């Protein structure tokens, strides 16, 4: 699963899905309905597996911000692990926005002060003195790719300093506090996902 998360992150990076704040998000309405809050809801009758894959094939038809990108990565990682038939059975209702709307089967949880952080973890780089005119840069959700590299939608792919520098360019005038990596990680419930696949086989 961790390998699938990394591969989905790199695929999303290569496809160059547009970065948009929630108020300006857009999606392919063949598969998704856009909510007023900027999230995307699977259209009735659409195959979940096809809808998720469409984000990676018709990329120009999608634009969203970094939290939703992580949600997309998680669903794509599970799709690649489960394959379409099982995925379609497991996820009949999908909402792409943030953790609160995720299917309970994935059930991501945030763990603080871990002894070890691992590739595939979702980390957060906080910008505590963000410019109030650009609140979208108050932080960046990133996927740990291993070897000190990260992917974050809207900023790109690089080491931690790359993300800190990008966020520091969007601080308020006179800011004294640098952006920093939060001592926490968000992870799907790998055990539950594994057991669901095992019991379905």
Language-model segments: which ranges?
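Cysteine-nucleophile amide-bond enzymes
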Residues: 1-122, 126-136, 140, 145-201
């Amino acid at each position: 699963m961790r390998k699938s998360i990394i591969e989905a992150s790199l695929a999303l990076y290569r496809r160059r899905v547009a970065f948009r704040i929630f108020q300006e998000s857009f999606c392919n309405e063949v598969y998704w309905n856009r909510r007023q809050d900027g999230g995307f809801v699977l259209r009735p009758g659409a195959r979940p597996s096809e809808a998720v894959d469409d984000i990676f094939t018709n990329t120009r038809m999608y634009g969203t911000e970094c939290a939703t990108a992580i949600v997309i990565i998680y669903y794509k990682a599970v799709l690649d692990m489960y394959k379409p038939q099982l995925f379609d059975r497991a996820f009949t209702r999908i909402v792409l926005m943030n953790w609160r709307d995720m299917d309970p089967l994935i059930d991501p949880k945030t763990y603080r002060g871990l002894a070890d952080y691992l590739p595939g973890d979702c980390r957060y780089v906080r910008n505590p003195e963000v410019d109030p005119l650009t609140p979208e840069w108050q932080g960046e959700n990133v996927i740990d790719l291993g070897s000190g590299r990260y992917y974050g939608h809207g900023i790109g792919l690089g080491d931690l300093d790359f993300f800190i520098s990008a966020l520091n360019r969007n601080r308020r005038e006179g800011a004294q506090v640098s952006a920093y990596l939060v001592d926490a990680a968000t992870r799907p419930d790998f055990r539950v996902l594994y057991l669901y696949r095992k019991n379905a086989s």
